[in-house]
């Protein structure tokens, strides 16, 4: 016979703790399934019970939760509970209501603030008003007017890229991802810091920081769900971390470089004054703004630099490389594009301005299809309102509930897009392109998101795409041919906030003829 006095106080305490955990977990499960304000929203029960189901698909399996959401919507309908306190929508006509351009005061959930390790950057700012305050000086610098003024430099760097392809790589295989990565690094480096990294001068365009943004992205889910991991990594000596995780060496090098440039600009007032007329960079603009002192410290500006440069590199590189792939892989597209560019630029040495390029219908159609299939951000855009109720059909979403929609689904929805996974520039050539439901197609074209938090770099990215593709495919003495490259090198198989292809992919490789 067992006697309670035979058990030590330690065992009794452990038993009580275990019982408490079991009772608490059971009670919480019952509450979330039957009494929570979202209890009547359809969706997988495991998602309603715990956030660990998302962790399983994104951290353990690897960037798959977005695809599970798409799959579950086919079962549960257009509104679905995907977390204990999160709702996801899949209704293309609801997108503009959920992310209105004017009047929205939504905030970002704090949980995701440190997923990139730069939580004080504009992109991950939580509060609506705080976001608007930080955004103001930067938004002016990325306005259409500013980018058009800067477009001459974008053209100059693109000319360097094309010249290097022609003179140094004929008969060789190059990776378009690496070439456009180098191009973007030289452009954004000068725009942000007032210097060029000369990435285009490296043999084969294999610059030191190539693919660093993809390496950073692969840590995003760990950073989102376990932010303390970054705290530990930052506290450990780099030499030990790089031995365990070799890709981290490139990330550390990239972060040090960004930090040194911010320190140079911030501390060297003489440099700032000297270059203000030559090229006033985005960080000069921030540091000379009327922001509070706490917004101008080195740590926050460093976070802004990481966010800005990282976003520009990954999205521009992927979209342009994907465009090159489909131009070369889709019958008739290259011929149509070259014919239009030749007619518009009889003398290939006389480049067109960005507005003139934007007026070319086929080039514009190619760029739109590239943006649609590249999907700059593959993850849902989470928001919440502390005060507002969201109403969708007969469902009411209470304040402080996280909600969102995916670009991934919006840009590939078979209810909107004819043959959504195919590259079809022709869909944009009608005088008024229409969706399958009869609505204007542009209503559903959201590669840069919409609302107060839409992508700041839209004009920058569009200028680079127009200039890059027009300059490259106007050259009648350069012929590109895909080399051991197919759909696996562009198709998205994982969501790490940005879309990633299979790990084995070597990118879009082309033979220069």
From Swiss-Prot:
This is Cytochrome P450 monooxygenase orf3. GO terms for cellular component: membrane. Gene3D superfamilies: Cytochrome P450 (1.10.630.10). It is found in: Membrane. Induction: Coexpressed with the other cluster genes on brefeldin A production optimized medium. Keywords: Glycoprotein, Heme, Iron, Membrane, Metal-binding, Monooxygenase, Oxidoreductase, Transmembrane, Transmembrane helix. Pfam families: p450 (PF00067). GO terms for biological process: mycotoxin biosynthetic process. GO terms for molecular function: heme binding; iron ion binding; monooxygenase activity; oxidoreductase activity, acting on paired donors, with incorporation or reduction of molecular oxygen. Its main location: membrane. The chain crosses the membrane at residues 11-31. Cytochrome P450 monooxygenase; part of the gene cluster that mediates the biosynthesis of brefeldin A (BFA), a protein transport inhibitor that shows antiviral, antifungal, and antitumor properties. The proposed biosynthesis of BFA involves formation of an acyclic polyketide chain that is differentially tailored throughout the backbone. Belongs to the cytochrome P450 family. Heme binds at residue 455. Its EC number is 1.-.-.-. The keyword Lyase does not apply. It is a single-pass membrane protein. It comes from Eupenicillium brefeldianum. It is an enzyme of class 1 (oxidoreductase).
């Amino acid at each position: 016979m067992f006697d309670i006095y035979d058990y030590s106080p330690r065992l009794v305490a452990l038993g009580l703790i275990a019982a408490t955990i079991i009772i608490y977990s059971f009670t919480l499960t019952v509450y979330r399934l039957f009494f929570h304000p979202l209890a009547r929203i359809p969706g997988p029960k495991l998602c309603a019970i715990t956030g660990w189901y998302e962790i399983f698909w994104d951290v353990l399996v690897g960037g798959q939760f977005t695809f599970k959401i798409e799959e579950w919507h086919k079962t549960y309908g257009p509104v679905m509970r995907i977390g204990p306190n999160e709702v996801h929508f899949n209704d293309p006509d609801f997108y503009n209501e959920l992310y209105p351009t004017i009047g929205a005061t939504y905030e970002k959930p704090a949980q995701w603030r440190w997923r990139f390790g730069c939580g004080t950057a504009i992109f991950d700012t939580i509060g609506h008003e705080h976001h608007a305050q930080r955004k103001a000086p930067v938004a002016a610098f990325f306005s259409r007017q500013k980018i058009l003024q800067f477009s001459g430099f974008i053209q100059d760097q693109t000319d360097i890229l094309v010249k290097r392809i022609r003179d140094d790589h004929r008969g060789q295989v190059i990776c378009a991802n690496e070439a456009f990565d180098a191009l973007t690094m030289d452009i954004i480096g000068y725009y942000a810091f007032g210097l060029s990294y000369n990435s285009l001068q490296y043999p084969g365009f294999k610059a030191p920081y190539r693919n660093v943004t993809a390496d950073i992205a692969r840590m995003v889910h760990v950073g989102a769900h376990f932010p303390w991991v970054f705290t530990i990594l930052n506290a450990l000596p780099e030499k030990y971390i790089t031995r365990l995780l070799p890709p981290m060496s490139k990330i550390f090098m990239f972060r040090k470089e960004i930090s040194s440039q911010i320190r140079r600009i911030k501390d060297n007032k003489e440099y700032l004054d000297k270059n203000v007329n030559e090229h006033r960079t985005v960080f000069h603009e921030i540091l000379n703004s009327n922001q509070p002192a706490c917004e101008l410290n080195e740590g926050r500006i460093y976070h802004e630099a990481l966010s800005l440069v990282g976003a520009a590199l990954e999205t521009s590189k992927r979209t342009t490389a994907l465009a090159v792939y489909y131009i070369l892989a889709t019958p008739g597209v290259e011929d149509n594009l070259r014919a239009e560019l030749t007619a518009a630029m009889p003398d290939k040495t006389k480049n067109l301005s960005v507005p003139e390029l934007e007026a070319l219908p086929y080039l514009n159609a190619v760029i739109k299809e590239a943006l649609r299939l590249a999907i700059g951000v593959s993850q849902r855009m989470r928001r919440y309102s502390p005060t507002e109720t969201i109403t969708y059909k007969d469902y009411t979403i209470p304040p402080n509930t996280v909600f969102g929609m995916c670009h991934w689904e919006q840009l590939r929805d078979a209810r909107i897009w004819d043959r959504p996974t195919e590259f079809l520039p022709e869909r944009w050539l009608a005088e008024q392109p229409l969706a399958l439901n009869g609505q204007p197609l542009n209503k559903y074209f959201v590669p840069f998101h919409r609302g107060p938090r839409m992508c700041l770099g839209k004009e920058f990215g569009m200028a680079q795409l127009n200039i890059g593709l027009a300059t490259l495919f106007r050259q009648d003495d350069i012929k590109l041919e895909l080399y051991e490259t197919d759909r696996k090198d562009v198709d998205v198989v994982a969501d790490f906030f940005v879309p990633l292809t299979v790990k084995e992919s070597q990118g879009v490789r082309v033979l220069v003829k």
